[in-house]
């Protein structure tokens, strides 16, 4: 989805230590102030640009993110130049990596720091439409003047990404900047004769509407498909040639044929050839269209195929969202298998593990974004359910708010079923965030502790949080001491500036977001390795 390249767009008016000292969080409870690197990392991996969260408006959150990027870009460039490419490629977070690169480069140029700016821009752009997205954001935010570093970085991305298939997928009169506009603004040198012909076609089509399709074979095949009969179009979809030879997308095909051939015939023809993400996002549409058992069985087998899952690079919560959108039995098992394959790095942990999932109001009152049904509480339950399934009988899973509830996970129960049952209990023990009291109630000597939360906990009257200056909380009497040898893992899915985990002290760690890389970091720490930023591992 285009965020900035729209016709209506207008200019806008790990080192181990990640915290620096005590602070008060959004709930008035005790917490810790993140270091600038820790705060930026925590925020970046959970950031949906422009989206409100429970405690923070979208514009304030964006301003905090942009300010952190600008500060770190001039003060710790090697760190930031590792974070942003990792954010786009491994964490698969698109918009925050693009806007972050723009603010980083702008700040560095203003400070007279010129090295590596073009390379950073190129590294965060991984789809052809993102060139115009970045360019539009730059012009909206910083004005129409384009420094040479920006031109070079975008030129590198254009040569790498502007292909006939990309042009058919992403170039549209609905966008504020067409591909031809970008070419005219950046003046990239074509990679070869074929790309030079593509540039010429795009420019002619943009300005005169008479681009010669014979210059670009894929464009000619697309025009031929549109000129064919409905039955021939459907046949080309069914055998895959419309997608391979004509560069068609499911959106193109649906817009052209749905009203005339019917949704059932259309989805049955397209289903075997849909890109993986498009397939899992359209399961509900296929259910509503009433596709046959045979067609759905073939697609389900593909969804559950380990190689397809690995190639798709989908984050675990994508499968959860697919299940929430289309909870029918014909997809459930395939999605369960897919999510298991997507989490190969989930560790088998020796001994006993305590997992506490925050079910307070801030965790379930709204989705991750304006378009998402998945709430932070669902994602947290997903994390806990995965750990419990991978370690049967050795993980004790609890929800907590004002009180706690224990959630037993049956051996062999699917992760998605676990999440559904767990989140069905939200509200059972209130809607507050009594983190320290909850830990006191249920910690009884387990070998490690996970707390999955937005880390905005209520005050317990002691001013003590997830530290361990003397045992667990740090200072004063310890009703339930946790030895220094016990690792406490905080999984922060809020990204706020204040947190509950004091990572300055031994065996207290904080991760951000819910990618499977968190599990890889846990494995490394359990094996005795030092904590590192994920792109440095």
Positions of PLM-derived features:
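Long lumenal/extracellular ectodomains of secretory and single-pass membrane proteins
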Residues: 2-373, 389-537
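Metal-dependent nuclease catalytic cores in nucleic-acid-processing enzymes
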Residues: 378-394
